[in-house]
């Protein structure tokens, strides 16, 4: 049974990796990425909400009847 000649395999593998690297470089070179988003400046007006100044009960148990 003849032996398999593996002396050229490192050359083939290295040339394949080089070709894949070059193809990926060319592919990423031709892609156009969106520019980074800049924050939109808005005029924020302070709201005068009555619940900001006093404590309110934010929980209620719906299974219990209301207690006064």
Swiss-Prot record:
Q: Which UniProt keywords apply?
A: Acetylation, ATP synthesis, CF(0), Hydrogen ion transport, Ion transport, Membrane, Mitochondrion, Transmembrane, Transmembrane helix, Transport
* Short name of one Pfam family: ATP-synt_8
TM region positions: 8-24
Q: How does it sit in the membrane?
A: Single-pass membrane protein
Q: Which GO terms describe its molecular function?
A: proton transmembrane transporter activity
Which InterPro entries does this UniProt record tie to the protein?
ATP8_mammal, ATP8_metazoa
**In the UniProt record, does the keyword Ribosomal protein occur?**
no
Single GO cellular component term:
mitochondrial membrane
Q: Which residues carry this modification: N6-acetyllysine?
A: 54, 57
Subcellular location, record wording: Mitochondrion membrane
Q: Which residues carry this modification: N6-succinyllysine?
A: 54
In the record, biological process GO terms are: proton motive force-driven ATP synthesis
Q: Which family does it belong to?
A: Belongs to the ATPase protein 8 family.
**Stated role:** Mitochondrial membrane ATP synthase (F(1)F(0) ATP synthase or Complex V) produces ATP from ADP in the presence of a proton gradient across the membrane which is generated by electron transport complexes of the respiratory chain. F-type ATPases consist of two structural domains, F(1) - containing the extramembraneous catalytic core and F(0) - containing the membrane proton channel, linked together by a central stalk and a peripheral stalk. During catalysis, ATP synthesis in the catalytic domain of F(1) is coupled via a rotary mechanism of the central stalk subunits to proton translocation.
- Classification via PANTHER family: ATP SYNTHASE PROTEIN 8
Q: Fill in the subunit field for this protein.
A: F-type ATPases have 2 components, CF(1) - the catalytic core - and CF(0) - the membrane proton channel. Component of an ATP synthase complex composed of ATP5PB, ATP5MC1, ATP5F1E, ATP5PD, ATP5ME, ATP5PF, ATP5MF, MT-ATP6, MT-ATP8, ATP5F1A, ATP5F1B, ATP5F1D, ATP5F1C, ATP5PO, ATP5MG, ATP5MK and ATP5MJ. Interacts with PRICKLE3.
- Name of the protein: ATP synthase protein 8
- Record the organism: Hylobates lar (Lar gibbon)
């Amino acid at each position: 049974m003849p032996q398999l000649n593996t002396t050229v395999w490192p050359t083939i593998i290295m040339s394949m990796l080089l070709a894949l690297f070059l193809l990926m470089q060319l592919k990423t070179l031709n892609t156009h990425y969106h520019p980074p988003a800049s924050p939109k400046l808005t005029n924020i007006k302070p709201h005068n909400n009555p619940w900001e100044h006093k404590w309110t009960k934010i929980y209620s148990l719906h299974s219990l009847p209301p207690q006064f």
